[in-house]
């Protein structure tokens, strides 16, 4: 497995692969891998001759009061896990490589970023879109693999790729979960044992919503009201947002007659967790 730090070296490496007719798959990450990351890498391995994984904790997608400085990092552990699942290249750039002196250019995706995380984390998606656009130009992948747990992020990146005529496929993969249903996240390490139990309210909310949907309920307000009451009864929780939105526009819907996603962000203690379920799709929670 090769480790690349410099942008020009990554670009040269990928260009040589493309000229040789080799297919590149790419998994962008912020590191501190869990099984969800590894599932994305396994999918990338199936789809490519060369699998590139980036590890970069992108400062432009964190707000001033967020967890940039304490975000978990362990490169040695990550590189070992990556090698075990067959990663060919880890791209591990510095801030100076990604955002050099006099950097001035940012990518803004408009409508699909105005709700949910876009409301509660101003500037977040500008940072996400910018770093992904830059990474796509550096790695030059044929396909990039993203998890559906960050559903709004996936929609945003697909919109950017379509609007800017980027020549790559964006692949969304199902959320990887712990055995008890909690969506895997690098931030789960922040949770105390008591908070870890309370965090199950997110996945249980999805199950509640799916049950109501399967029983024929299509009124978004009634589904949200029952979930809100449940989460508010769980210790150490505070709802950031709880909404049912269109899967294409990410705007609130009143009825689930169109393709819709339940999206929620909940603070458990001081840790902000997200989860979602697209109604009508499989929900891999027991």
From Swiss-Prot:
The keyword Transcription does not apply. It catalyses: (R)-pantoate + beta-alanine + ATP = (R)-pantothenate + AMP + diphosphate + H(+). GO terms for cellular component: cytosol. (R)-pantoate binds at residues 61, 153. Its main location: cytoplasm. The active site is at 37 (proton donor). Signal peptide: none annotated. It is found in: Cytoplasm. Its EC number is 6.3.2.1. Beta-alanine binds at residue 61. It holds the Pfam family Pantoate_ligase. ATP binds at residues 30-37, 147-150, 184-187. GO terms for molecular function: ATP binding; pantoate-beta-alanine ligase activity. Keywords: ATP-binding, Cytoplasm, Ligase, Nucleotide-binding, Pantothenate biosynthesis. Catalyzes the condensation of pantoate with beta-alanine in an ATP-dependent reaction via a pantoyl-adenylate intermediate. PANTHER family: CYTIDYLATE KINASE/PANTOATE-BETA-ALANINE LIGASE, PANTOATE--BETA-ALANINE LIGASE. The reaction proceeds by a bi uni uni bi ping pong mechanism. This is Pantothenate synthetase. The lineage of its organism: Bacteria, Pseudomonadati, Thermodesulfobacteriota, Syntrophia, Syntrophales. The gene is panC.
């Amino acid at each position: 497995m090769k480790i690349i730090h410099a942008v020009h070296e990554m670009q040269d490496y990928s260009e040589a692969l493309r000229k040789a007719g080799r297919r590149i798959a790419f998994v962008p990450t912020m590191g501190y891998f869990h099984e969800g990351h590894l599932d994305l890498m396994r999918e990338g391995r199936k789809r490519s001759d060369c699998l590139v994984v980036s590890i970069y904790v992108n400062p432009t997608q964190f707000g001033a009061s967020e967890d940039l400085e304490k975000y978990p990092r362990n490169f040695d552990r990550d590189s070992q896990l990556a090698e075990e699942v067959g990663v060919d290249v880890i791209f591990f750039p510095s801030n100076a490589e990604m955002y050099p002196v006099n950097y001035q250019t940012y990518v803004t995706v408009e409508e699909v970023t105005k709700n949910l995380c876009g409301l509660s984390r101003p500037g977040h998606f500008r940072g996400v879109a910018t770093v992904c656009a830059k990474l796509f130009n550096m790695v030059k992948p044929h396909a990039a693999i993203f998890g559906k747990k960050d559903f709004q992020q996936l929609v945003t990146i697909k919109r950017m790729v379509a609007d800017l005529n980027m020549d790559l496929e964006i692949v969304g993969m199902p959320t990887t979960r712990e055995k008890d249903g909690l969506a895997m996240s690098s931030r789960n390490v922040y949770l105390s044992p008591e908070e870890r139990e309370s965090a199950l309210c997110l996945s249980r909310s999805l199950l509640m919503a799916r049950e109501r949907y399967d029983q024929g309920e299509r009124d978004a307000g009634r589904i949200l009201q029952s979930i809100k009451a449940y989460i508010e009864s769980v210790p150490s929780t505070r709802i950031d947002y709880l909404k049912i939105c269109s899967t294409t526009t990410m705007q609130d819907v009143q009825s689930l007659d169109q393709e819709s996603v339940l999206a929620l962000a909940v603070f458990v203690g001081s840790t902000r967790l997200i989860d979602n379920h697209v109604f009508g799709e499989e929900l891999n929670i027991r």
